[in-house]
């Protein structure tokens, strides 16, 4: 599947974390959600795209295993994210920390 997104040709970093209640979140550390400091784009099965505070999620959710994030990765690929690069942690490019 060829990507039609503006970032086509670039790898999109994604960090998968698992909350204590079992929900898995995909964080896109290089895709800002708004101009607010620390707010990045995220994706979950329920709610789908939304804002997330990157540092808060890292502090409250643990790294997800491949088995835990597999379904969410498949869902992301099915909606056009064909260029994902799974990383454990990343420093958002647009946040001065």
List each language-model region with its residue ranges.
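Acidic, low-complexity, intrinsically disordered interaction modules
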Residues: 29-70
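Negatively charged, low-complexity tracts enriched in Asp/Glu with abundant Ser/Thr
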Residues: 2-13
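A short beta-strand micro-motif
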Residues: 12-21
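Short, solvent-exposed loop/hinge segments that bridge or flank secondary-structure elements
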Residues: 21-31
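Mixed-charge, Lys/Arg-enriched low-complexity segments
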Residues: 54-97
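Generic detector of short, aliphatic-rich beta-strand segments that form the cores of beta-sheets
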Residues: 1-2, 61
């Amino acid at each position: 599947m060829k990507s039609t997104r503006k970032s086509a040709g670039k790898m999109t970093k994604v960090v998968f974390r698992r909350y204590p209640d079992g929900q898995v979140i995909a964080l896109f550390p290089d895709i800002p959600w708004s101009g607010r400091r620390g707010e990045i784009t995220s994706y979950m099965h329920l709610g789908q795209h939304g804002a997330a505070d990157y540092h808060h999620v890292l502090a409250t959710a643990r790294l997800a295993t491949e088995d835990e994030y597999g379904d969410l990765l498949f869902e992301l690929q099915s909606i056009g994210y064909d260029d994902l690069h799974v990383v454990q942690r990343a420093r958002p490019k647009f946040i001065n920390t």
